[in-house]
């Protein structure tokens, strides 16, 4: 049976295995997990893999993805990871149970929207402990939380932070202790319990595994370690997980032996880059029906170790198959393991078919 390419094969059973492994590791140290779905746009196959995994909530950065979670009918609370603009506050209140925020203006808009909807909305105040993405600076946290706690239709559920995303800052015991101490100060200043202390994302797992995670951290937002089974600090395999959870499959549309260096004067390629080539003589090269419109060539790794990705234009992926372990021909399929960035692109591309396999 012929199956269309390009396609993204989502192995539900393998992701479910990873989810159970990672969530069990966290649970052993009293940490609850919000499973992050954004890299795959909250695809139903991913949601099926996460259902019953032990996660306490589902988290995403996009309101549209939270809608998909609601439509799937999963009985889990949701968390909006990216603060909404004031104009999007009503939608945030409608589709999220918790929202991460970092400014009073956003909190005020959420409170107004919650009042209009007749609900009480939970917010988590983000504190920037050094990665320089979102979050109030630590010396302003108590003041900001105290102001927000007075808004009529909000509940400040706790504090959170984010590391190893923009600045690549590695989570440490000291940074986690700072967050716990700030929570305690905010609790004293407001009289609110602020029970949730969300210490970060998959980057916190090595600290957890080392036994150095402070007891006050009770929540993490985990995506890549579950979906791709990677230690995000160095992309090595995370213990107890699989890395073959999602495969990008392309079909070969041309197979020819060609020189390894272009012939003629060269300038920039279609994307404004100047490319350098090494003369390796004649090589057997294949073109797959994938391109940069679907995924960056540097963000995928062939499953066959003898295949090498050479580059891509918008719609053509060029690979060297001279040393392929499995012979290929026009019409053959080539499998690739995507990085986090590669999976993000392929999941977003409407040109890549998504196909679920296996059962949780």
Model-derived regions: residue spans:
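Active-site loop/helix belt of alpha/beta enzymes
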Residues: 128-247
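Active-site-proximal beta-alpha core segment in soluble small-molecule metabolic enzymes
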Residues: 7, 31-174, 181, 189
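N-terminal capping/small domains of soluble enzymes
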Residues: 18-21, 28, 39-52, 65, ...
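Conserved, mostly hydrophobic/aromatic
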Residues: 15, 38, 69, 125, ...
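Active-site loop ensemble at the mouth of alpha/beta enzyme cores that anchors a bound cofactor
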Residues: 205-288, 294, 301-302
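C-terminal accessory subdomain/extension
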Residues: 259-360
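Generic N-terminal amphipathic, Lys/Arg-enriched alpha-helix
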Residues: 1-10
